[in-house]
Amino acid sequence: APAAPAGNTIPKKARVAMMTEKKHFELQEYDLPEVGDDDILVKVEGCGVCGTDAHEYKNDPFGLIPVVLGHEGTGEIVKMGKNVKVDSAGKPLKVGDKVVTCMIFKDDPDIEMFDLNKKNVGGADVYGLLPDDDIHLNGWFSDYILIREGSTVFNVSDLDLKSRVLIEPCAVLVHAVERAKTTGILRFNSRVVVQGCG
């Protein structure tokens, strides 16, 4: 599998901010996992803190502890599996590209992300909201994250870091507006109130 360019050596270990109990993180270090044929190893460059992260930190409503939070992240590809050629939109991927990711469709890795009907998303997971496992690099609150087969990943190399970190929150906004339109209550030029910011 392609590796990082000379001078950009990949360490053998990575640190994660592991939430080990409510309102408590521990900085833990783990060996970097092997990168499978369909996986991508990303060096984390930035991650936003979502309201969901705050809820998980305070109350663990999803029962995820221990967990590495962070789902509004972005970073640089440092290693790719041999089968990884393009992102979820068909744009070519290579070591050094900047990426974002969101869902993992573990039950059906071939689900069409752009299918507006979204018939089966019951088996979807989100990086940063995965219970800990033997990989450990499951959230963006870490040095590295392993993007696994069946994940949505997008090449956003043309954007600066601040813009890349805002992609996931903006996607949530667009999704919320699209869902609101399906209620039949909203019409073109409807006035709405946006309450809260997360």
Label the predicted regions.
Residues 99, 190-196:
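Beta-strand segments within the central parallel beta-sheet cores of soluble alpha/beta enzyme folds
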Residues 22, 78-84, 149-151:
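Short loop segments at secondary-structure junctions
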